[in-house]
């Protein structure tokens, strides 16, 4: 079983594209013990209760990502870019090119999305399936990074966030 982004961009190539499956991977060979897919509920607590009431913690994304050991390579990628750019300040900064495919940009992933989308020298392409999906992604992006930041990063010739309609149907 392949992954959509890899099927589109890595098919038959000797690509050096790096992937991070922050929500785990679907595989026919997985069973209930080996499946590392992350499924969640929205945060429903506020204030101190958010850290004290852990009755349903196993349903929160951050917990599942830790427990199931899903992708966190993005942290290393960000650190590598920052280290390179600080060590070689006179060279052209190393870009961070991100491609987000098949993701709702829901606020439950805000902790990761904020770090990636707001990173220095990042350029993000967000793929959408249809206009309805685009509407939802824009609305969710506003919840994640705020209206002013969305406008700043999607307007003008120096935009850092681009939306692109996916033109391929991969089964």
Give the label of every model feature segment.
Residues 87-171:
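SIR2/sirtuin-family catalytic core signature
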Residues 30-31, 36, 51-54, 79-85, ...:
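Detector for Asparagine
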Residues 44-46, 80, 84, 110-115:
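A generic signature of intrinsically disordered, low-complexity regions enriched in glycine/proline
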Residues 65-89, 107-108:
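A Trp-anchored, charged/polar loop motif used as the substrate-binding/catalytic surface
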Residues 1-77:
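Extended, H/D-rich, highly charged conserved domains that either
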């Amino acid at each position: 079983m392949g992954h959509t982004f890899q099927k589109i961009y890595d098919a038959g190539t000797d690509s050096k594209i790096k992937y991070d499956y922050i929500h785990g991977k679907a595989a026919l060979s997985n069973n209930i013990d080996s499946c590392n897919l992350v499924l969640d509920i929205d945060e429903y607590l506020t204030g101190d209760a958010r850290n004290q009431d852990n009755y349903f913690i196993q349903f929160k994304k951050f917990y599942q990502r830790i427990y199931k050991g899903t992708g966190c390579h993005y942290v290393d990628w960000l650190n590598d870019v920052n280290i390179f750019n600080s060590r070689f300040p006179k060279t052209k900064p190393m870009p961070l090119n991100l491609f987000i495919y098949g993701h709702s940009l829901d606020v439950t992933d805000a902790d990761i999305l904020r770090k990636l989308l707001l990173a220095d020298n990042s350029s993000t392409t967000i793929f959408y399936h249809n206009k309805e999906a685009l509407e939802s992604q824009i609305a969710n992006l506003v919840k994640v990074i705020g209206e002013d930041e969305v406008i700043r990063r999607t307007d003008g010739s120096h935009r850092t966030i681009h939306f692109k309609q996916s033109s391929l149907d991969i089964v």
